[in-house]
A protein has these predicted regions:
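C-terminal helix-cap and adjacent tail motif
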Residues: 8-17, 27-44, 51-64, 69, ...
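Generic N-terminal amphipathic, Lys/Arg-enriched alpha-helix
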Residues: 61-67, 82-97
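Small-aliphatic-rich amphipathic alpha-helix that forms the alpha element of a beta-alpha
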Residues: 88, 107-112, 186-237
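An N-terminal domain-cap segment
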Residues: 91-114
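Glycine-rich phosphate/pyrophosphate-binding beta-alpha loops
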Residues: 115-119
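Short, electropositive alpha-helical surface patch
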Residues: 234-248
């Protein structure tokens, strides 16, 4: 369910941003690195020298022996895991207590175990703990969100958000001890300089985000799933990310504030989301 929500949100956000950029004729500028000499994206399928697999064709296949468990134990673990994940909530008020670096390393490593199209692993996880950088991120997002709420977002969209008590002011971006920004790599470059396509990069990154949220919940932290509208270029420049990367998700991560509250809402029942055939 986490993955489905993230996938829909990412696709919806991308369509809105693309439409907006087309209207305003937005031009991308990269303040930190000079990518002016970057090779143009082109289809090299007609070039015989290009038709080399992303990983060696003779990559050996090895036995796979996951831990064997009796079905009774599998059932027990499925119940325990559901009970844990059912407690996950989106939180907008965070404790400022720092997170050990090893915890952040482990949850990102867990996200990196996600499957991806043709094993391209098209993701970059930028973990921000520096207070000045967090403030710069907050300023960018609040600038754009003020415009989003007043002009870009439909009245129905804004109305639908009212029960969640959210607006263009985002204190959690500086309160949370860490921000994890997930960037999607649309392509990369092979060692020989040829472009390496990242197939199904959107769904691959969406699945990885689901893994990331599950890891955050499992270790006892909380997060907010945020998809900053029209912030991609400015945040990418701020964090020195290359032009083949696009921001897909921003997660403030930490412990919940001691006075945090969440909306009293219920998830759909199993019979509303599952069909057995």
């Amino acid at each position: 369910m986490i993955v489905c929500f993230i996938t829909f949100t990412i696709f919806h956000k991308n369509r809105i941003e693309l439409a907006h950029q087309n209207r305003i004729g937005a031009k991308k500028k990269f303040a930190i690195h000079d990518y002016s000499k970057e090779k143009e994206q082109q289809d090299d399928d007609d070039d015989p020298d290009y038709l080399v697999s992303a990983i060696p064709e003779d990559t050996p296949h090895i036995p796979y022996k996951p831990l064997a468990r009796p079905m009774e134990k599998i059932l027990e673990r499925s119940r325990e895991y559901y009970d844990l994940m059912a407690k996950r909530r989106t939180v907008r008020s965070f404790s400022t207590e720092p997170i050990p670096q090893e915890v952040l390393d482990n949850i990102v490593k867990t996200a990196g175990t996600s499957p991806s199209g043709a094993f391209t692993e098209p993701w970059t996880f930028v973990v921000v703990q520096d207070p000045e950088v967090k403030l710069a991120i907050r300023n960018i997002i609040e600038d754009e969100e003020e415009i989003n709420y007043s002009r870009r977002m439909s009245r129905q969209w804004v109305t639908d958000l009212k029960p969640f008590a959210t607006n263009h002011i985002k204190p959690y971006l500086t309160d949370a001890p860490a921000l994890i920004l997930v960037f999607r790599q649309t392509y990369s470059w092979r060692a020989d300089g040829k472009k390496k396509m990242h197939y199904y990069n959107e769904i691959s990154v969406a699945i990885a985000c689901g893994f990331l949220l599950a890891a955050i919940q499992y270790c006892g932290l909380v997060a907010l799933t945020s998809t900053p509208l029209n912030c991609n270029t400015r945040l990418r420049d701020l964090l020195s990310r290359p032009p083949n990367e696009r921001l897909e998700l921003l997660l403030p991560v930490g412990k919940p504030h001691e006075d945090v509250t969440v909306p009293d809402i219920k998830r759909k029942n199993l019979d509303e989301i599952m069909i057995n055939v």
